[in-house]
């Protein structure tokens, strides 16, 4: 089995640049995932985020999760649970407007630390999008502009904890899915594993590494690249020991952004993917998250065809 792609971003600044860009290209085309080290976010910032996130879970969320488990009788399940996940989560929105000051139970230090962390992640996401542009032969800023919409991109962080699970063979931490959006930056626990991706019909562990950022590509980048880059299925396996922390930050198109394959990436006039408004895709995704992505793309194609038909009738 090939090794999971680990990219040292510092190598972009020296003789290793061409090799590093090729590694990023290969990861985007064949894995849909890669792991970044030396990405520019200070280790002490990440350590503080981890300490405060785990402290907040212990103080505010652990007991609620235990009560939820008890109320649903999940400790005693005998058959596979297919309609919920073994995770405790909350969501922080950063762009276009922040909700950090409104989220209950966060102390002021945690709010400030997460605001700072989000700014650093936003900058890193935009740097990565430009590296993807370079590899794709697109002008710098193309992907950021494609995501922009009228109010800029959507950017937010799903803060998750995956507590010890008594029946990990019957309950997933997070069921298999692809991510609907753009580019996802994950700061995950370096001691408790669980994240897996599907490659060549095999589930492969994403290795926990201290101070790394795991990057994966969402459905919108598969569309814009006309399938050159892949959004892949992934899942979280619950563990019997240890609570796994995960902060997944989603840099997504704005709600009204119109998403379609970049014209320069359509070879021999073959456009594989549809044109659609991002918010329409998200409405469809909400009900189909844990199903394959291909039917979602087909549904958007049908919607696109209907829009074109209406336009033709209107102009006739």
From Swiss-Prot:
Pathway membership, UniProt: Alkene biosynthesis; ethylene biosynthesis via S-adenosyl-L-methionine; ethylene from S-adenosyl-L-methionine: step 2/2
Keyword ATP-binding applies: no
Catalytic activity: 1-aminocyclopropane-1-carboxylate + L-ascorbate + O2 = ethene + L-dehydroascorbate + hydrogen cyanide + CO2 + 2 H2O
The keyword Glycosyltransferase is annotated on this UniProt entry: no
Chain positions recorded as Fe cation binding sites: 177, 179, 234
Molecular function (Gene Ontology), one example: 2-oxoglutarate-dependent dioxygenase activity
Entries under InterPro entries matching the protein: DIOX_N, IPNS-like_FE2OG_OXY, IPNS-like_sf, Oxoglu/Fe-dep_dioxygenase_dom, Plant_2OG-oxidoreductases
Fe2OG dioxygenase domain span: 153-253
EC number: 1.14.17.4
Biological process annotations from GO: coumarin biosynthetic process; ethylene biosynthetic process; fruit ripening; response to molecule of fungal origin
Record-linked SUPFAM superfamilies: Clavaminate synthase-like
Cofactor(s) this protein cannot do without: Fe cation
Leading EC class: oxidoreductase
Pfam family, one: DIOX_N
Top-level taxonomic group: Eukaryota
Tissue expression as described in the entry: Expressed in all of the floral organs examined apart from the sepals.
Keywords in alphabetical order: Ethylene biosynthesis, Fruit ripening, Iron, Metal-binding, Oxidoreductase, Vitamin C
Family that this chain belongs to: Belongs to the iron/ascorbate-dependent oxidoreductase family.
PANTHER family in the record: OXOGLUTARATE/IRON-DEPENDENT DIOXYGENASE (PTHR47991)
Official protein name in the record: 1-aminocyclopropane-1-carboxylate oxidase 4
Source taxonomy: Eukaryota, Viridiplantae, Streptophyta, Embryophyta, Tracheophyta
Gene name in the database record: ACO4
